[in-house]
Amino acid sequence: LSIFILVIAAYTVYLDAQISAKFAGNKWQVPAQIYARPMFLSLKQEISIKEIEEELQLLGYRRVTRADSSGEYQVLRNSIRIQRRKFDFSHGTENLRNIEISFKNARISQIQDLNSRQSINNIYLEPWLVTRLVSSGREDRMLVQINDVPPILTQALVAVEDQNFYQHFGVAPLSILRALMANISAGRTVQGGSTLTQQLVKNLFLTREKSLVRKAKEAMMALIIEVRYSKDVILEAYLNEVFLGQNGDTGVYGFGLASYFYYDRPLNELSIDEIATLVGIIKGPSYYNPRKHPQRALERRNIVLRSMFESNQLSPNEYQDLVTLPIKLASGASLKKGKHPAFMDQVRRELRLVLDNPDIRQSGLKVFTTLDSNAQMKAERAVSEGVAKQEKRIGKSGFEAAMIVT
């Protein structure tokens, strides 16, 4: 017995070292993010409301009748109101800002901070994310911090995946017992009793093999993690690790990236039904893929909403309203690959020269480029219209054209 205890103790120390090393370092590789030049707006600048609106739409802002939340804007007769998002610019972090830009004679006549009621001389919109430099076949994720995650997301996650998350110490014996009885009844492994912590262990450290030995290791590691780290640290790791879809040959991991993949917006701008849809995907990202199987995704979302209602996170009226909503997805254009290939080839070449260490290029680096998205849109529109006119004038189709923006 003493030898057995010594072996278990030694193995526990070994697992603890593995866990500590993983949590102390960079748990994940995060692709470099390539941004265009941010739109700069200043007094007396010659620009139209339409041009600003085009930029806002490119950035995934939503046009509303009253702009009250981050990522929203409203167009008035001679002005535009914008809830400019918080962003880490190259010159430093700028917080959420509620502004109104007024126009006179096709120029900006005033920029006002609506919270302070003070006029300002200029402001940046956050830059457009052109692409993410993901290696072929790799995981992609956009890391989030627990303090930036909407509380309703963690509440929904716990309600659906692990209702006793805040009470247990990494394993839930009753859940394991229920799963064990189901497996014995079926004569094979058909059900798991994993907590969120065990799911995190499985994703970070283990294979998907279903065996008692692996399950025992999973439970031991879950207990160690619970002793070493707070519930918030565990939740944050889970939110960034979980698999939520496939973008071509690249895996979509974590809620931060999934928010853009399915809705083209940051996580803190999603509605409750959209958050419930993402939580529902966890059970089977392929089976509940809302693009390929919208009805399945809808039914699964409503199960999540039901769990939230039963956990007193939603009122009866909120629940009834939310389950009637259809699933509406964005195009996922913000993560579309192959945008501006010639420009991106040049960016990659310069990055290899400046940053020869590939690990640095996979550390979540933000790269701010000179690409002017506003000029690019004008150029593309001019070329498209010009080619169409020439084809109509000559009576032939299939013309090609090129333009250089300097």
Regions from the language model: what does each represent?
Residues 1-394, 403:
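Juxtamembrane regions of bacterial inner-membrane/periplasmic proteins
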Residues 399-406:
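C-terminal soluble interaction/assembly domains
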